[in-house]
Each structure stands twice: as structure tokens, then as C-alpha cells.
Design a protein with these regions (language model features):
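Terminal targeting signals and extreme-terminal segments of soluble enzymes
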Residues: 1-111
Length: 111
């Protein structure tokens, strides 16, 4: 069950339909925990198959998770059927990731 405080059930259903149409969601076993206007929270379980060379979560996959959850946060503002693309992305890793991933995206400025 997806938590929300600002979206209608119809909006949640439309978002979840769009989310589950993207193959990376199933591939990474990503679960969407919360959708609110301009916000999304996702979870990806830790699995050895996602490791990089140091037996920690591969940085490229962490970036993919962040990019994906950010997309869903944006779509809560502009509509689940809107066409979007990442044009610029920057991430700084603070330490290795040896656990499940919880990712929270919040739209600061739309447009």
C-alpha cells in the first residue's frame, strides 16, 4: 500500500500503473512506499547481485534508483502521463552502501 496525504486514489492508481510499466522497477525489486505532490519515497532491497567491485551496492545502480524515484516525484506535480527525461544529473556518494536502499525525492522547483 502506497502512503499519501495529498493525492487522490485515482492519481495514485495512475502513477502506480505508469511506475509498473517501467522494467527497471521489477528488475531492481523497487517498492514505492510513498507518493505525495512533489515527493516520492522508494525502497530497493540489498542483494549481492547488485554489488560493485568492493562488495557494496554498485554506484551506478544507486544513481539509477535516485533518478527513477526523482522521476516519480516530478510526475506527481505534472501528471502521470507527462513525458519527462533526465537532462542533467549529479550525485555525490558519502560512503559505501551495504544495506537496503531507501530513496526520498522532493521537487524543489518545477520548471
Amino acid at each position: 500500500m502506497v502512503e499519501t496525504s495529498s493525492l487522490s486514489q485515482n492519481e495514485i492508481d495512475a502513477m502506480m500503473k505508469r511506475i509498473h510499466s517501467v522494467p527497471i522497477i521489477e528488475t531492481l525489486q523497487m517498492e514505492i512506499l510513498r507518493l505525495d505532490e512533489g515527493e516520492c519515497e522508494g525502497h530497493v532491497p540489498r542483494a549481492k547481485k547488485w554489488d560493485g567491485i568492493y562488495q557494496t551496492f554498485h554506484g551506478g545502480l544507486l544513481a539509477t534508483i535516485a533518478d527513477t524515484v526523482t522521476c516519480w516525484a516530478i510526475l506527481t506535480k505534472i501528471g502521470s502521463e507527462a513525458k519527462v527525461a533526465t537532462t542533467d544529473f549529479n550525485i555525490r556518494f558519502l560512503r559505501p552502501c551495504n544495506t537496503d536502499v531507501r530513496c526520498v525525492a522532493r521537487v524543489i522547483k518545477a520548471g
